[in-house]
Curated annotation (Swiss-Prot):
GTP hydrolase that promotes the GTP-dependent binding of aminoacyl-tRNA to the A-site of ribosomes during protein biosynthesis. Mg(2+) binds at residue 26. It catalyses: GTP + H2O = GDP + phosphate + H(+). Transmembrane segments: none annotated. The lineage of its organism: Eukaryota, Viridiplantae, Streptophyta, Charophyceae, Charales. CDD domains: EF_Tu (cd01884), EFTU_II (cd03697), EFTU_III (cd03707). It is an enzyme of class 3 (hydrolase). Residues 174-176 are annotated as: G5. One of its GO terms (cellular component) is mitochondrion. The gene is tufA. One of its GO terms (molecular function) is translation elongation factor activity. It comes from Chara connivens. One of its GO terms (biological process) is mitochondrial translational elongation. Signal peptide: none annotated. It is found in: Plastid, Chloroplast. This is Elongation factor Tu, chloroplastic.
Amino acid sequence: MAQEVFQRTKPHVNIGTIGHVDHGKTTLTAAITMTLAVNSTCTPKKYDEIDAAPEERARGITINTAHVEYETALRHYAHVDCPGHADYIKNMITGAAQMDGAILVVSAADGPMPQTKEHILLAKQVGVPSIVVFLNKEDQVDDEEILQLVDLEVRESLINYEFPGDKVPVVSGSALMALQALTEKPNTSRGENKWVDKIYELMDAVDSYIPTPKRDIEKPFLMPIEDVFSIQGRGTVATGRIERGILKLGDIVELIGLNEKIRSTVVTGLEMFRRLLEQGFAGENIGVLLRGIEKKDIERGMVIAQPGTIEPHTRFEAQVYILRKEEGGRHSPFFAGYRPQFFVRTADVTGVIEAFEYDNGDKTRMVMPGDRVKMIVNLICPIAIEKKMRFAIREGGRTIGAGVVYKY
């Protein structure tokens, strides 16, 4: 693991790029890191370094969510570059659930596309609180009126999904032109290039419009596991974003979910962006080195938690809203015995919906799109469940419902 110690001098904010495939999300991410590296210690990242997984590069499409870091004068950011390809919305659900705000990238040459709207809907569903818009590829648009039309169209799309579209900052520019300018002259300062200035303008909007979140550090520690890897000679590292609480070196923790057995272990190392930590706080993306745990013992979808604070369950009761067709949901009703996927934190588990009733206690045999119902769910394997926990229900590549657990 890393040797340099991470210094906390600025508020930490989790942000991400969302939007339609090929509208320039990864190019913009690279342009931001290169622009801000001029005035900070953060490492600039080239497009190829962000679009890193081999299967992504081959298709020119981002698959896994890629984490990079950068800082402005006011804040330290962890940035997740979200997939834009329809098959990989699953990753966006787990990636976007970690965002304190998002940059919606829309090509000024094309305007909003189906995935633009799907990503806005998903951002709403997983609780991304604020969105800032970057109209990319401005260099390809000669007519100012077209820019204004796209601006209007994007704002309308945001309003349709209950974001304050009339108040959302919209910055136009060209990530590619900024990237080219920075590649030719890496230390380009503000005021030297109009395209680089647009990136600064975008980050000013992000700094001022996306609020610094209040972190839940008083509650018992919990971190959903996103990824797991082995470090030779050191052990197994689990990565994820701390949902609540504080984790310190030497803490005893439990691994919970995906099987009945709860394992106990000790935290022997902590790091964030390859720098050592003494402790990790709610909201931070960290790597946790765990004593005596093999890679086969732990996987994405489990949680690491303070002992005795959360348990694995397969059966729970929840209050659920089933999306209407216009909201991207099902077109037809479903019945008891229906087996969709349940997305809970980073877990993705099939479950059987055993029974449902309306809020007033009336029983019903079928559930229609647009209904609010209470339902009993039986999962095929146990996951860490608690009251008031939110989840998404998905089927065939789309979200069909969202719910909150009230009993287990």
